[in-house]
């Protein structure tokens, strides 16, 4: 997974950070470690060695700028070269809110195209657009039902043919007529093809018929550097209106390979899928991506995620925690925030210094566990939530019966509470929590509450 890549690169850089003296031998040793980490992530060997030469040349022969130590200069060189590897500048999906924007989503079978259609609709909905979805994939049995469930969840209109008696062209034509008042129409095209040639032929037909503003190729991140072939064929076929969305970046050891392979041929990567939830789609920005990978954080994305969640309850709980109070009530509020904002691991990766330093277990909570923990806490008394230390065997039996769980699961919750409390106390003394103004407030809020 990508967190392993980030951890491996950070372990290499820590040799620089912790060294009393940085010489040529140490630089070469660190570069070898970085090479190994990238190759394990399925980044093309030629790209890795070309990047390594640049790092070595600059680290050994360049003088550090004024105000920057030799160590920091080398770390910045590594950061800059990794950003170059992924294309340097992020590219946004530009749409005209005054006109109807048609977006075609195409992809090989199993790429995650249908889920990505809903995620993209949700992303554009949050940007103020009025998107609609057209389910034109009539070949995969569950495609329509899947998109229907997702669209209902995010309250976005959908047109499709559950009977599967119409062609993709007919469904799309009907949908475009139906959604005259919507400014973005996302078409989930037929994903019947297992090879690029068939997919590109279908895409060409749809392009000629419906004249889309954007065609997005959905690529499975687990392909690693093999993604290059799909991206190149696509780029050559669509000229200047195509972009790439890479899925499964949260669970693929080859995600870095897929990103670098696509960036190598100059195909614009505009989005990456970072999880299973409908909100787990992010605009791709190489600088932000590498910042998170190296534990430097991503404050811009952090602010975006916190924009809509600061309310009175959040403020009250935040104030309590900043006074040193962290009970199960505060944990409950935190878990509710996670369900709104994404996984704790993703959120912590946006905080400088936290992506790679989070205590083991502090971010290890699945959606299933989150719901179960909340049920357990709902079965506790106010006194128990305020004073978790009093929860012994007899109380556990009563709580377990009320929540319909095993006592072991209550112990697991209490252990998670203890780990999270320790993480909070460790970070409470950090600079992030001492920041003033709106930024400091949001940073504190995001880390420990809502």
UniProtKB/Swiss-Prot annotation:
Reactions catalysed: GTP + H2O = GDP + phosphate + H(+)
Q: How does it assemble?
A: Part of the signal recognition particle protein translocation system, which is composed of SRP and FtsY. Archaeal SRP consists of a 7S RNA molecule of 300 nucleotides and two protein subunits: SRP54 and SRP19.
Name the major location: cytoplasm
Give the SMART domains listed for this entry: AAA, SRP54, SRP54_N
| Pfam families tied to this protein | SRP54, SRP54_N, SRP_SPB
* Keyword terms: Cytoplasm, GTP-binding, Hydrolase, Nucleotide-binding, Ribonucleoprotein, RNA-binding, Signal recognition particle
Question: Which Cys-Cys disulphide bridges does the record give?
Answer: none
Q: Which Gene3D superfamilies match?
A: P-loop containing nucleotide triphosphate hydrolases (3.40.50.300), Signal recognition particle SRP54, nucleotide-binding domain (1.20.120.140), Signal recognition particle, SRP54 subunit, M-domain (1.10.260.30)
Q: What protein is this chain from?
A: Signal recognition particle 54 kDa protein
Q: Name one GO biological process term.
A: SRP-dependent cotranslational protein targeting to membrane
């Amino acid at each position: 997974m990508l967190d392993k890549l980030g951890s491996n690169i950070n372990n290499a850089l820590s040799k620089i950070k912790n060294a009393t003296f940085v010489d040529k031998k140490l630089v070469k040793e660190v570069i070898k470690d970085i090479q190994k980490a990238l190759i394990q992530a399925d980044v093309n060997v030629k790209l890795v060695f070309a990047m390594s030469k640049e790092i070595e040349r600059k680290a050994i022969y360049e003088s550090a700028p004024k105000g920057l130590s030799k160590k920091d200069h080398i770390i910045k060189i590594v950061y800059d070269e990794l950003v170059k590897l992924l294309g340097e500048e992020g590219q946004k999906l530009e749409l005209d809110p005054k006109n109807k924007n048609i977006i075609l989503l195409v992809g090989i079978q199993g790429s995650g195209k249908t889920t990505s259609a809903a995620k993209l609709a949700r992303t554009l909905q949050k940007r103020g657009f009025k998107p609609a979805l057209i389910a034109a994939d009539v070949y995969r049995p569950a495609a329509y039902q899947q998109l229907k469930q997702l669209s209902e969840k995010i309250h976005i209109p959908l047109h499709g043919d559950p009977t599967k008696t119409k062609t993709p062209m007919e469904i799309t034509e009907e949908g475009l007529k139906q959604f005259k008042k919507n400014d973005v129409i996302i078409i989930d095209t037929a994903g019947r093809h297992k090879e690029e040639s068939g997919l590109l032929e279908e895409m060409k037909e749809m392009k000629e018929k419906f004249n889309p503003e954007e065609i997005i190729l959905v690529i499975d991140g687990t392909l690693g550097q093999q993604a290059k072939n799909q991206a190149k064929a696509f780029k050559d076929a669509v000229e200047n209106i195509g972009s790439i969305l890479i899925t499964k970046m949260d669970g693929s050891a080859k995600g870095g390979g897929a990103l670098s392979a696509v960036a190598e041929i100059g195909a614009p990567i505009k989005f990456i899928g970072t999880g299973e939830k409908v909100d787990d789609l992010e605009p791709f920005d190489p600088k932000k991506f590498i910042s998170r990978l190296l534990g430097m954080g991503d404050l811009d994305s952090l602010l975006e995620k916190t924009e809509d969640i600061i309310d009175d309850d959040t403020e009250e709980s935040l104030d309590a925690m900043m006074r040193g109070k962290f009970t199960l009530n505060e944990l409950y509020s935190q878990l509710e925030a996670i369900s709104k904002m994404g996984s704790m691991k993703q959120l912590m990766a946006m905080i400088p210094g936290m992506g790679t330093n989070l205590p083991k277990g502090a971010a290890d909570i699945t959606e299933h566990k989150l719901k179960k923990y909340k049920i357990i806490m709902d079965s506790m008394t106010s006194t128990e939530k305020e004073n978790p230390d009093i929860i012994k065997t007899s109380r556990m039996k009563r709580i377990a019966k009320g929540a319909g769980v095993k006592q072991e699961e209550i112990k697991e919750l209490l252990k998670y509470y203890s780990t999270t409390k320790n993480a909070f106390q460790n970070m409470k003394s950090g600079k992030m929590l001492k920041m003033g103004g709106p930024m400091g407030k949001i940073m504190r809020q995001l880390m420990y509450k809502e």
